[in-house]
Curated annotation (Swiss-Prot):
It comes from Paracoccus versutus (Thiobacillus versutus). This is Amicyanin. Pfam families: Copper-bind (PF00127). One of its GO terms (cellular component) is periplasmic space. Cu cation binds at H80, C119, H122, M125. The gene is mauC.
């Protein structure tokens, strides 16, 4: 049987790894315009969509033109969001609101660049938007 004394350091190590992993997603500059979550049914038919299911972004990398909008659509009961970091420790971090099942979140990318993102409560969920 595993004792609490043995388990606590392991949990602490996992937590520190997760925190460190999110710091690796530092951004030099992000210029986005966001909306609050909307019903997935309201996402335009011709939109660039990243689905979320089974604890992952289904299209982990998308390429768009500056000024275009990406919609993240949550298809599962587990709440998710989209977050970007501007600094290693999270200064000026952008974190979208949590989406529940059948909700979508839209972000407009106004400047060219490569934008790595992750889900705040699930930092192993990662993706990238490349803006040309």
């Amino acid at each position: 049987m595993i004792s609490a004394k043995t388990l606590r350091p392991a949990i602490a190590a996992i937590a520190l790894f997760a925190i460190g992993a999110t710091g690796a997603w530092a951004q030099d500059k992000i210029t986005v315009t966001s909306e609050k979550p909307v019903a997935a049914a309201d996402v335009p038919a011709d939109a660039v969509v990243v689905g979320i299911e089974k604890m992952k972004y289904l299209t982990p990398e998308v390429t768009i033109k500056a000024g275009e909008t990406v919609y993240w659509v949550n298809g599962e009961v587990m709440p998710h969001n989209v977050a970007f970091k501007k600094g290693i420790v999270g200064e000026d971090a952008f974190r979208g609101e949590m989406m529940t099942k059948d909700q979508a979140y839209a972000i407009t990318f106004n400047e060219a660049g490569s934008y790595d993102y992750f889900c705040t409560p699930h930092p192993f969920m990662r993706g990238k938007v490349i803006v040309e």
